[in-house]
C-alpha cells in the first residue's frame, strides 16, 4: 500500500463501510491516519470494525434510503470534525432479479439505495467540503458486461457514472474532484458465499486479461489514490478495477 502523507488528519466519509470493499477502504484510510467516519446498516459489523480500529474510526448506523438520516449524519460529522476532505459513496445492493419479476417497488427501492442516496449524500456533504476535496462514486463493470437478471442494478450503476460526470463539472470551480471506481468481480466474503462457485472462478479467470482474482484491498488502493493530492488533475473520470475484463 502506498502512503499518502497528506491524508493524515483529513476527514473521510465512507458509506457501506462495515463489510467487503467498504471495510477494506475504512482500514486503508485508517492506516493513512485519516479520520474515517463510516456508515452501514450492519450495526454489529460496523461497531466491531470501529472498536478494532480504535481512534480515528467512527461508525454510525444510517439508513441511506431516508433523507433525514443522511442529513443528520453528515451535519453531525461536519460539526464534530470540521470540513470533509473525502467522500466515498460505496453502499449498494446487487440483487439478481429476472426482468419479469422486477416490480415497480423493487425498482424504486433499488434506485433509492443505489443512486438517490449517492446524490443526497453528495448534496449534503457539498455544504461542508473543503477546497480540493475528493468525491468517489462507485459504479460497476456490469455497466459494460450487462449480465442477465441484473437490469435494474445495471441501470443504477449507469446513473452513478452520469452523476459523477455532472458533479465534476458543477463542483470543479471549487477545486473539488469527482471520479468513479467501477470494480470487476471482487472476492468479498458475501460474493464468495453467495455467488462465486468454482465455475464462476473459472469464468472470471477466462474473461480477465490478467487471470488473478480481484481483492477488496486492491480497490481500496485506487480509492486512496483518488483521495490523495496525487490525483489532483483527475476529475470526471472512471477507473475500472477488473484486471482487464473490460479492456479499454
Question: Where on the chain are the PLM-derived regions?
Answer:
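Residue(s) in the substrate-gating loop at a strand-loop-helix junction
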Residues: 140
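Substrate-binding pocket helix/loop in short-chain dehydrogenase/reductase
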Residues: 98-99, 103-111, 200-204
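Short C-terminal tail/terminal secondary-structure segment
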Residues: 1-4, 145, 224, 235-248
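Active-site helix of classical SDR
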Residues: 122, 156, 164
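A conserved structural motif in NAD(P)-dependent oxidoreductases
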Residues: 208-219, 230
Amino acid at each position: 500500500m502506498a502512503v499518502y502523507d497528506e491524508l493524515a488528519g483529513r476527514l473521510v466519509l465512507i458509506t457501506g463501510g462495515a463489510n467487503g470493499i467498504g471495510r477494506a477502504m475504512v482500514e486503508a484510510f485508517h492506516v493513512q491516519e485519516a479520520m474515517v467516519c463510516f456508515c452501514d446498516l450492519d450495526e454489529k459489523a460496523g461497531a466491531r470494525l470501529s472498536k478494532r480500529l480504535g481512534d480515528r474510526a467512527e461508525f454510525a448506523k444510517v439508513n441511506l434510503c431516508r433523507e433525514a438520516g443522511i442529513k443528520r449524519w453528515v451535519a453531525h460529522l461536519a460539526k464534530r470534525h470540521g470540513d470533509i476532505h473525502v467522500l466515498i459513496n460505496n453502499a449498494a445492493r446487487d440483487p439478481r432479479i429476472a426482468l419479469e419479476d422486477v416490480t415497480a417497488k423493487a425498482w424504486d427501492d433499488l434506485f433509492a439505495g443505489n443512486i438517490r442516496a449517492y446524490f443526497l449524500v453528495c448534496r449534503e456533504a457539498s455544504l461542508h467540503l473543503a477546497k480540493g476535496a475528493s468525491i468517489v462514486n462507485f459504479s460497476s463493470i456490469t455497466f459494460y458486461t450487462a449480465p442477465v437478471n441484473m437490469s435494474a442494478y445495471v441501470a443504477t450503476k449507469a446513473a452513478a457514472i452520469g452523476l459523477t460526470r455532472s458533479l465534476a463539472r458543477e463542483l470543479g470551480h471549487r477545486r473539488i474532484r469527482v471520479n468513479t471506481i467501477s470494480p470487476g468481480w471482487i472476492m468479498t466474503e458475501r460474493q464468495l458465499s453467495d455467488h462465486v462457485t468454482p465455475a464462476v472462478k473459472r469464468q472470471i479467470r477466462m474473461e480477465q486479461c490478467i487471470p488473478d482474482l480481484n481483492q477488496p484491498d486492491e480497490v481500496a488502493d485506487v480509492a486512496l489514490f483518488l483521495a490523495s493530492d496525487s490525483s489532483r488533475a483527475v476529475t470526471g473520470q472512471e477507473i475500472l478495477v477488473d484486471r482487464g475484463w473490460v479492456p479499454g
